[in-house]
Amino acid sequence: MAISRLIINHFRNLTAIDLEFERGFNFIIGNNGSGKTSLLEAIFYLGHGRSFKSAVANRIISYQQPHFILHGKIQEQQHQWSVGLQKQRQGNTLMKINGEDAKKISDLAHLLPMQLITPEGLTLLNGGPSYRRAYLDWGLFHHNASFYNAWSSLNRLLKQRNSALQQVCSYEKLKIWDRELTKLAYQVSYWREAYAEALRSEIEKTCQLFLPELEISVSFHQGWDKNMDYADLLQQNFERDRALGYTFSGPQKADFRFKANGLPVEDILSRGQLKLLMCALRLAQGEHLMQQKKRHCIFLLDDFASELDQYKRTLLAERLQKNGSQVFVTAITQEQLQQIQPEKHRTFYLENGRIKDL
C-alpha cells in the first residue's frame, strides 16, 4: 500500500495542506514545533481512526475550528482507493471509502497497514504486556480475516463478565458467559501463539542485522497456566475474581517477551539498543506481512536521528528501501539524512504548519 496524495484541513497547526507523496521515501524536515510529527500523526489517524499522541479529539482539531478533515488517495498495484475521515469536536467520526460510508475503523485499518517508529515506541519493550499484545494482534488482524471478530467478541464478553462479577454471589450465574469466553480464549490464544511462532525466525534474523552482538530470543505466554483447563480455572478463581472485580487470568493477560543473552531486554539493554530492537521488531513484522500476504506496510519514522548513529540509520534505510515500502521520515536538518539517498524519494520542508516541496 502507498498513499499517493493527502489533504489535511485543521489538524493541529496544519490548517490547509495538499501533498503528493513518493511511493518510496518521503523526508519531512523542520525545526521542533514546525508540525513534522503532526503530519505523521495525521497519516496514522487516517489509517487507525485515532492518534498516537492524544486520545482527546479537541486537542487535535485546530483552534476555533469545528472539525478536522483528512482525505487520502491510496494505491496498491493496479488498485486505487479514496478514503476520507472527519472528526468533530462533539466526538462524532465520519468515514468514507470510495465515496461510500464506512461504519468501522477496521475498514480503514485494513486498507492501510502501518508501522510506527517513534522515541515513545520503546513501550513495546519496557511497557506493560498490553503493548506487546497489541503488536501480535496487529499482525493477526492483517493476516487472519477471522481474528478481528473473535477478538472483539472476547473483549466484549470480558467486559460483561467483569460487570457481572460485581453483582453475582454464586458461580452458577457466570456460566452463561464462561462457556463462550472459554471457547474464544482458546481460539485467540491459539492464533496468537501460532503467529508468534511464525514471526520468530523473521525477528531473530532481523535482530542479527541490527544487534549482532546479542542473542535475542522471544517467547509467548498465553495469560494462564498452560497445564490448566481455562474453564476449570475460571470456576476455581471465582471468589478471587469477585473480590477483585475483574477476571484475573486469561488471554487479556497474554504477553510476548523478549530476552537478550537470556535476560529481559528492558533490564540490560541501553536506550539506544532498545530502539534498535524496536526498529527490528517493526521491520520484521512488516516484512512478514509482505512475504505472507504480498502487502506492503507504510512505515512512519519520527525523529529519525534520535539515538541511532549514522551507520544504523543507513542500515535501516537500506532495509526499508529493499523491501519496497513507502516510508515517511522526519528530521530536524537535511544533514541528518545526507547519507540516505534512496532511488525514489521526495523531500518536504515544514515551517509553522506550512509545507513546501524542495
Swiss-Prot record:
Transmembrane segments: none annotated. ATP binds at G30, N31, N32, G33, S34, G35, K36, T37. GO terms for cellular component: cytoplasm. PROSITE patterns: RECF_1 (PS00617), RECF_2 (PS00618). The keyword DNA-binding applies. GO terms for molecular function: ATP binding; single-stranded DNA binding. It comes from the Bacteria. GO terms for biological process: DNA replication; DNA synthesis involved in DNA repair; double-strand break repair; SOS response. Gene3D superfamilies: P-loop containing nucleotide triphosphate hydrolases, RecF/RecN/SMC, N-terminal domain. Keywords: ATP-binding, Cytoplasm, DNA damage, DNA repair, DNA replication, DNA-binding, Nucleotide-binding, SOS response. It is found in: Cytoplasm. The keyword Nucleotide-binding applies. The RecF protein is involved in DNA metabolism; it is required for DNA replication and normal SOS inducibility. RecF binds preferentially to single-stranded, linear DNA. It also seems to bind ATP. Belongs to the RecF family. This is DNA replication and repair protein RecF. It comes from Histophilus somni (strain 129Pt) (Haemophilus somnus). The gene is recF.
